Amino acid sequence: MRADLSQATFIIPIRIESPDRLRNVITTTAFLLENFDTNIIIQEVDKQSVFEKEALPILEDIVEVDIWKNFNFIHKKSDEPLFHRQRVLNEMIMECETDIVVNYDCDVILPKESYTLAYKGIMDNIYDVVYPYGQGMFQKQVAATDITVSKFLETGDYEFLNAVSKDHTSDFGWAQFFKTSVYKEGGMENENFKAYAPEAVSYTHLRAHETGND
């Protein structure tokens, strides 16, 4: 049974530059669709849509729910060499109609309870912003293969990922749950950061503290 995250929208900006990134995009999207009743917006910015050609057919084959029920895919054609992640995020934030928006990285999978606890904390008005991991703790870097992620998706057993992972620092983490109104009122993402970089995540965390939204 899927957990109810119906008042959350996961916004996932992507540019698929490698087979590893393609695998990660498929894995994280399938994981969210299979485990949560939620909303997803994926926006790909590139010359051509790798997601539409390579990922969508696989997702339609392996995911056992109607993937189009609460899923929106957008491709914006662009020849820009830099992936302007913050601008893409802001465009997707403005599309959100749910109480919670999740700035979500396509390379991240969290323990299932991390999603539900973050969601509940915001819906219960305990928090405005939740970082499910990070803050000086650690993350697991997974050396995934197609076989590994297939077994994980089929069984939901995190041990398949743990077996091929190592501990690594996580800083502020690449996934944040926001109360949507707070995210918008706070100015959303700083588009002066024009590429994919950890400074942008650190800035978001610092701004949340300075405005009292933590």
Give short role names for the model-derived ranges:
Residues 1-31:
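N-proximal low-complexity "stem/linker" segments adjacent to membrane-targeting elements
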Residues 15-20, 47-49, 107-110, 136-137:
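Short acidic, S/G/P-rich loop/turn micro-motifs used as interaction or catalytic elements
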Residues 31-77:
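Acidic donor-binding segment of Leloir-type glycosyltransferases
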Residues 79-95:
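Glycine-rich, basic loop-to-helix element that forms the pyrophosphate-binding segment
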Residues 99-109:
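Short beta-strand-to-loop acidic/aromatic patch adjacent to the donor-nucleotide binding site
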Residues 111-191:
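Conserved catalytic core of nucleotide-sugar-dependent glycosyltransferases
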Residues 195-202:
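Acidic donor-binding loop at a coil-to-helix junction in glycosyltransferase catalytic cores
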Residues 205-214:
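Single conserved hydrophobic/aromatic residue that forms the stacking wall/gate
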